[in-house]
């Protein structure tokens, strides 16, 4: 999709851009694959804020996406390419030959009328899903499982992709979007191609109201709060932090402290870290 530029008729429209939605083929989603979503506004079951900066925004229906792609040997036809308000990627409605309908992530290059299939014998073609062990070295993939049969957990955002680097025993080496090289079981599935809608990251929001439409509330700096609300708060005028290091609202170190579990079992599966040259 291309980027749409607006004339600066107001300050909000100045520098504002949006997607032109040229790839979208319908505005009407498949009703059988919709689930209602309740707006939690970042609150838990006690009504307390557990995730800040959430609330408001447009009502949405959740689209049930097939992340497992486990209907082996059953061909499907792409019927529509649709917008999904719950993710950055577009989605595609596919009709299987046995009558089942499903949504999948729409990879770059997938077109209406195209036929796709899943299984170990599937061709290396955009939209097809195979076990990692059956995918040749150098192939660009997305929608990757971490546990066989659980459903894809990696490389699902718009424009994201990974690459198969090789095979070591029952594991396959995959270079992720971040540059991290990781070993993943060869029986885990992945889909061929890059996730579509890659220009989504180039959109300039332009005004605060567009973020409010998305359910994103303002982020207030700790330094302008009172000391009972934030460790950075208080003081006369623009006071410094007053601590050895910046803190979160709950007093924990912020900005740079590593939060990964040092005993994470998946450490042994990471061949190269994302920040290594």
From Swiss-Prot:
Q: What is this protein called?
A: Large ribosomal subunit protein uL2
InterPro entries assigned to the protein according to its UniProt record, in alphabetical order: NA-bd_OB-fold (IPR012340), Rib_uL2_dom2 (IPR014722), Ribosomal_uL2 (IPR002171), Ribosomal_uL2_bac/org-type (IPR005880), Ribosomal_uL2_C (IPR022669), Ribosomal_uL2_CS (IPR022671), Ribosomal_uL2_dom3 (IPR014726), Ribosomal_uL2_RNA-bd_dom (IPR022666)
**GO term, biological process aspect, one:** cytoplasmic translation
* Native source species: Streptococcus agalactiae serotype V (strain ATCC BAA-611 / 2603 V/R)
- The source's superkingdom equals Bacteria
Which GO terms of the cellular component aspect does the record hold?
large ribosomal subunit
Q: Where is this region: Disordered?
A: 222-277
User: Which HAMAP family did the record assign?
Assistant: Ribosomal_uL2_B
Give GO MF terms, alphabetically: rRNA binding; structural constituent of ribosome; transferase activity
Pfam families in the cross-refs:
Ribosomal_L2, Ribosomal_L2_C
Family, similarity comment: Belongs to the universal ribosomal protein uL2 family.
Function, as annotated: One of the primary rRNA binding proteins. Required for association of the 30S and 50S subunits to form the 70S ribosome, for tRNA binding and peptide bond formation. It has been suggested to have peptidyltransferase activity; this is somewhat controversial. Makes several contacts with the 16S rRNA in the 70S ribosome.
Q: Which UniProt keywords apply?
A: Ribonucleoprotein, Ribosomal protein, RNA-binding, rRNA-binding
Subunit structure, briefly?
Part of the 50S ribosomal subunit. Forms a bridge to the 30S subunit in the 70S ribosome.
Xref: PANTHER family: LARGE RIBOSOMAL SUBUNIT PROTEIN UL2M, RIBOSOMAL PROTEIN L2
């Amino acid at each position: 999709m291309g980027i749409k530029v607006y004339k600066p008729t107001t300050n909000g429209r100045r520098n504002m851009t949006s997607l032109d939605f040229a790839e979208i083929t319908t505005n009407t989603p498949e009703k059988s694959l919709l689930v209602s979503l309740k707006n939690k506004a970042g609150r838990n079951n006690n009504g307390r804020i557990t995730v800040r900066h959430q609330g408001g925004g447009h009502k949405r229906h959740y689209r049930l996406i097939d992340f497992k792609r486990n209907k082996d040997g059953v061909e499907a036809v792409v019927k529509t390419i649709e917008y999904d308000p719950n993710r950055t990627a577009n989605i595609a409605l596919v009709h299987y030959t046995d009558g089942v309908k499903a949504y999948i992530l729409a990879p770059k290059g997938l077109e209406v009328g195209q036929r796709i299939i899943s299984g170990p014998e599937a061709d290396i073609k955009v939209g097809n899903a195979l076990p990692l062990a059956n995918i040749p070295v150098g192939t660009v993939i997305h929608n990757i499982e971490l546990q066989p049969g659980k459903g894809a957990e990696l490389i699902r955002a718009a424009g994201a992709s990974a690459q198969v680097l090789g095979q070591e025993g029952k594991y396959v080496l995959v270079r992720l979007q971040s540059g991290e090289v990781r070993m993943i079981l060869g029986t885990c599935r992945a889909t061929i191609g890059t996730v579509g809608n890659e220009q989504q990251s180039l959109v300039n929001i332009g005004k605060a109201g567009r973020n409010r439409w998305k359910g994103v509330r303002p982020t207030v700096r700790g330094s302008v709060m009172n000391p009972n609300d934030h460790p950075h708060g208080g003081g006369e005028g623009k006071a410094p932090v007053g601590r050895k290091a910046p803190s979160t609202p709950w007093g924990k170190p912020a900005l740079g402290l590593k939060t990964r579990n040092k005993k994470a079992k998946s450490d042994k599966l990471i061949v190269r870290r994302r920040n290594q040259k």
